[in-house]
Structure formats: structure tokens, C-alpha cells
């Protein structure tokens, strides 16, 4: 089903007009993006009340434990507006996951560099992977989604038909047993954690079908949530994944629920985020899938169109490696 943008949605309600005072009619105020306000409120809470902790990267964080946000995807797409989010990188990384790939060089070839720091020679050697080729991240997200339980060799090996294809199982269950409470996809595999350049931060997704409304919703559990850089990407990524699965199963997107464990702000992100907190959220854009796609593996970046995206400028934040 090809999604067509609609005008308004419950996540972007219009502010009430002021009472008539006999003067010229008041102009309607801009919509309020309540979903993004919840993200900003969580940032404020962490900066004001978070516990200062040292972490793996030695940068240090302000951290709280156990947070949740909810995004309504029925009439808009949750791409944050208080800073520009690089949607092409979000989409290309997700398509890389869906393809079961673990070679960061494939993303580099598309000018997407979000995995460069964790796949460099220096980083791999530091993590003890001295015999692993540059770019080979080990059995990370895509491998677990498509080949859970298979024996990992290198990023260049052919894993066709090996392991459990969790993504395919999710789609088949949505089609054939939509009320199942076990529509789950996990990237957390304790046997493979020691082989990964970086253990999965976003660990487990559960999908929920409302047959009454014909909607697909997703809840993500994320063990480690970098609110400045990672979380805006993760929101958009799992929202896009839900749209894609809904599209190939004949459903409409519903809610994306984002549940987080260690929810943190890196200390070197505090000042940039204070700048972001001074900005007023704008309405979320819409996502259009431009053609009918039958199989999840057939999506290409060119199939996605983001419309009416009017974000504030980019804010520079350094990635903690």
C-alpha cells in the first residue's frame, strides 16, 4: 500500500485561537509538535537531574535509567526538527541492516560514515580484533536480524539460508497470525557479543497489529541511548522500518514506542544540546513510499520521499568512540 500524506495529525495539534477582542482576526498559531516536545523535555530532565558517570568511551555522561517516548506515525514521520537529521544516512543504514550486511565499507561507498569510528583499524585493534579486516564489524544488527544463530566468519562470507531469519519471521507472523504476542526481533545474542565491534544499543523490537484499525505499531527496547546523536537516528530508523513492514503487509503505521534503559547525554554534548533546547519544534514531515513494494528486500533509498521537512540547522556534536 503506497502511503499518501495527509494534512494534520493528532501529534501536531493546533493551538486554540485567542478570544475575539474586537480587533482584526487573529492568525492561527503554528501547530505544536507534542511528540518532539517530549524528547526535549527528557533532554532537560537528564541535563538537570542525571547522574554523572564515567563510561566506556571515557567521555563521561549524565544518565538516568528507564525512559519512554511515544511517536504517532499515522499522519507524520518522526524526523526531529530542532536540528536537521540526515535522513539518507538513516535509510541507507536501515537498508544495510535489512540486507543482513556487516561491512561498514558498503556504507562508506554511499558516503555514509556513521560506522567509520567503530570499524577503523585502530578501533578494531583496540578491541582485540587484530585479524579482522577494516570495515568488518562482526555479527552486528543485520546479521542477527537475518541469520541469528549462524556461525559468523567474515563480512564477505555467504550466509544464505543459515541461521534464523527473524525479519522474515516477523513479516510472516504479521500476515498469518497478527494477534501473536511474540512478534519480536532481537539483535542481542550473548554468544556473539564478544565477536561484535560494538554490542547492539537498540536490542529488541516488538510489533503489534491492531486488526480493528489495520495498523502496525512497534516498541523498541534500547539498552543504551545516546540522546544527542544516536536517539534521533534510532527514532527515525525504527519508524521507517515500521513503515516498510506495514507497506509489505498491507497495514498502516500506528505508534512507535521507544523504551530506553541507560538514557544519557555525553558531557561534550551538553552545550550543543542546550542550544537545541532553545529552539521551537516544527511540525514533523511526511513520508511517502513512491512505489508498490512486495518484498522487504526490494526497497531502495529512491523509494522514500520526505516531504514538508523544515528543520532548524544542523548542530555539530562529536561521536564518542
From Swiss-Prot:
The keyword Transferase applies. This is Thymidylate synthase. Homodimer. Keywords: Methyltransferase, Nucleotide biosynthesis, Phosphoprotein, Transferase. PROSITE patterns: THYMIDYLATE_SYNTHASE (PS00091). Its EC number is 2.1.1.45. Residues 1-32 are annotated as: Disordered. It comes from the Eukaryota. The modification Phosphotyrosine is found at residues 39, 208. Belongs to the thymidylate synthase family. The active site is at residue 201. GO terms for molecular function: thymidylate synthase activity. The modification Phosphoserine is found at residues 24, 26, 210. GO terms for cellular component: cytoplasm; cytosol; mitochondrial inner membrane; mitochondrion. One of its GO terms (biological process) is methylation.
